Swiss-Prot record:
In the N-terminal section; belongs to the transposase 2 family. The lineage of its organism: Viruses, Viruses incertae sedis, Bicaudaviridae, Bicaudavirus. GO terms for molecular function: DNA binding. Residues 1-22 are annotated as: Disordered. NCBIfam families: guided_TnpB (NF040570). Transmembrane segments: none annotated. This is TnpB-like protein ORF457.
Length: 457
């Protein structure tokens, strides 16, 4: 059935978003979503594998074609005919992709809608601090090899997840594909994306759900029967507040309004980051040499190795961040915290330094992990711009001098741990409160299999 219009539909998982609470103070309340994504690995047989490749390539081709025409319209006319291009490419691809062509076009619609929203924010001077450039939607292809990425997009009502038999049923393509993995979330399913991971030579299904939702006026037939029907698992035990300063050597410095001070050391994150970037640099150098001498097959293989190392680094960092977030939020829950003021270190990533200091990705992912875990415990989270929070004394509002050992010296005659000063300033900026008596820090090291206390600190 053809679409009635080029409408903008939203079936994807949404990360927490920030809306101004006190705009002039740089404090933004995080808005939670009830959307989560189950990710499982598919185990297609030989016939299914070949069919998936054809369909995924066709799906990506549709995305790129409509995106190319819309980009040309934008660059030449300054506007985009969403409805006209939607109808044109739906008619072109509906025979092979069926109604799933709508899902591909809707995904591109959403990308353009997001782009125009950011353009408007930029014109109004309200662009989020971590966004420096606004560009039209890009293509579904690898930047270096220029090959299309394999991604099959399926409309939310054109597939079924058989949780009992571990099978993913694609109605329009007559396929029942076995899968392995945990279906953590229970709820109404959204738009499915099946993605081929070239670095692992494996297919993964990304199944978004509205957690706990089974009805929208009437009971939906399209429900993923996962383990959890609710995101929130507990309520706050008290009304205390906490502030979090994110950093490099100390990943998180946390101050609670009762004077509790928590420190999470970043030894493992830096080890992983620099180890993998060294290996990646070696592979990049070798890839450049093979390209220069015309060894194209070897060059492509080295590009795959480079991507594999990047993805492995990201997986390891995400695992560390989730371990930290889980331990931190559980600790704050036991301490009776109900509100968190989370520093947004946009100023750090703008300063010159090594890649670890200037890379925005780790900070955004760490913030995301903390916010998602806080949602499970019913805590409110506000993001606070960290601008100048480490340069001024939290107690006297005067500029401090920082020595190499991580201590700031106030002209008024006292010293503070720089990460403590940052956390105190975040709390002060957010609610106008300064914790006068801070307890001895509880220090932890974040590892891949646990978060362990550091004795004697």
């Amino acid at each position: 059935m053809p679409p009635s219009s080029g409408q903008l539909l939203g079936d994807e998982e949404r990360e927490p978003t920030s809306t101004p609470a006190i705009p002039e103070e740089g404090v933004y309340k995080v808005k939670y979503s009830n959307r989560r994504t189950n990710i499982v690995r598919l185990l297609p047989n030989g016939f299914q594998e070949r069919k998936l490749r054809r369909l995924a390539d066709l799906s990506a081709k549709l995305f790129n074609e409509v995106n190319y025409e819309r980009r040309q319209q934008f660059f030449h006319e300054g506007k985009v005919d969403i409805k006209g291009t939607y109808k044109k490419y739906y008619e072109k691809y509906k025979e092979k992709l069926r109604t799933n062509a709508q899902a591909v076009l809707n995904k591109n619609n959403e990308a353009w809608s997001s782009f125009f929203s950011l353009l408007n924010l930029k014109k109004e001077g309200k662009l989020p601090q971590h966004i420096k450039h606004v560009s039209p939607p890009g293509y579904c292809k690898d930047r270096k090899t220029k090959k299309r990425k394999l991604i099959l997009i399926v409309r939310q009502d054109r597939y079924k997840v058989d949780a009992e038999n571990n099978k993913l049923i694609l109605k329009d393509f007559n396929m029942e594909i076995e899968f392995v993995g945990r279906l953590r979330w229970y709820g109404k399913q959204g738009r499915l994306e099946i993605i081929f991971d070239e670095t692992r030579n494996a297919w993964y299904a990304h199944i978004p759900v509205e957690v706990g939702v089974e009805e929208t006026g009437k009971k939906s037939k399209h429900v993923v029967k996962g383990e959890r029907k609710s995101i929130q698992i507990a309520k706050p035990k008290g009304n205390k507040v906490a502030s979090i300063d994110l950093g490099i050597n100390v990943i998180a410095s946390v101050v609670v309004s009762d004077g509790t001070w928590l420190l999470y050391k970043g030894i493992r994150t830096k080890e992983d980051y620099f180890y993998f970037h060294k290996r990646i640099a070696e592979v990049q150098s070798l890839a450049d040499r093979t390209r220069n001498i015309g060894e194209y097959e070897a060059y492509l293989e080295l590009l795959r190795e480079e991507r594999r190392l990047f993805k492995k680094l990201k997986r390891r960092l995400l695992h560390l961040y989730r371990n930290l977030a889980s331990h931190l939020i559980k600790t704050l829950h036991e301490l009776g915290v109900s509100t968190i003021y989370l520093g947004n270190p946009f100023n750090i990533v703008q300063e010159k330094g090594d890649n670890f200091m200037t890379d925005k990705w780790p900070y955004r992912k760490l913030m995301h992990a903390i916010e998602l875990k806080a949602q499970e415990y019913g805590m409110k989270v506000y993001e606070v711009d960290e601008y100048n929070t480490t340069k001024y004394c939290a107690y006297h509002d005067v500029k401090v001098k920082r020595n190499p050992r991580g201590v700031v010296i106030c002209p008024k005659g006292h010293k503070l741990h720089s990460d403590l000063n940052g956390a105190l300033n975040i709390l002060k900026k957010a609610v106008g409160v300064v914790v006068n008596e801070v307890k001895k820090p509880l220090s932890f090291i974040v590892d891949h299999n646990r978060v362990a206390p550091i004795k004697g600190v």
